[in-house]
Design a protein with these regions (language model features):
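Crotonase-fold acyl-CoA enzyme core
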Residues: 37-151
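Glycine- (often His-adjacent) and acidic-residue-rich active-site loop
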Residues: 1-34
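Conserved small/polar residues in nucleotide/adenosyl-binding loops
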Residues: 170-172
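Short beta-strand->loop
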Residues: 164-168
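Short, solvent-exposed polar/charged micro-motifs at secondary-structure junctions
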Residues: 137, 162-163
């Protein structure tokens, strides 16, 4: 339930005073952070097609894509602060949203509509649900017609700028 608050003791049980905690840390770092970094660094452009709920880890997976197209009924949320967690492992919130909006997004844990996500620059396009697949495929086809080397070098350059701004310093 998106509106439910969670007892932190429940979450802490899985993460404190347990043998093999180092294994859990390494596993989470690999499964979440490193996986996201590898997806982000794929040389070819990637597009997230979002409809419905995009919550916590869903945001993490969408944000590593180069472009995000959302249906008008989509929403984004990250209620993990209510669980006593400071965000998902791939903590890109202040890069995807400006820092003040990222704080609002996390502190309140409320849903952000696709329209607001577009206004904040998190989403490239918002389209009717019935048009989502068509519009996404059309964009992918246009990109696929571009010279590969130019796309790869452009993506690397923009990712490098994000890294210089601190995105590469994200860690668990």
């Amino acid at each position: 339930d998106i509106h439910k608050s969670y007892d932190r003791k429940t979450m802490w049980y899985d993460h404190t005073n347990k043998k093999g905690g180092e294994f859990l840390y390494v596993r989470e770092q690999e499964v979440y952070l490193n996986m996201c970094r590898r997806w982000r660094d794929i040389p070819k452009p990637t597009i997230a097609m979002v409809h419905g709920a995009c919550v916590a880890g869903g945001c993490m997976l969408a944000w590593v894509c180069d472009l995000i197209i959302a249906s008008s009924d989509a929403f984004f949320a990250d209620p993990v602060v209510r669980m006593g967690i400071p965000g998902v492992e791939y903590f890109a919130h202040p890069y995807e949203l400006n820092p003040r909006i990222a704080k609002e997004f996390l502190f309140l844990g409320e849903r952000m509509s696709a329209a607001r996500a577009y206004e904040m620059g998190m989403v490239n396009k918002v389209v009717d649900k019935s048009e989502l697949k068509k519009v996404t495929n059309e964009m992918a086809e246009k990109i696929a017609d571009m010279p590969r080397l130019g796309l790869t070098l452009t993506k690397q350059a923009i990712n490098h700028v994000e890294d210089l701004q601190g995105l590469s310093l994200i860690h668990i």
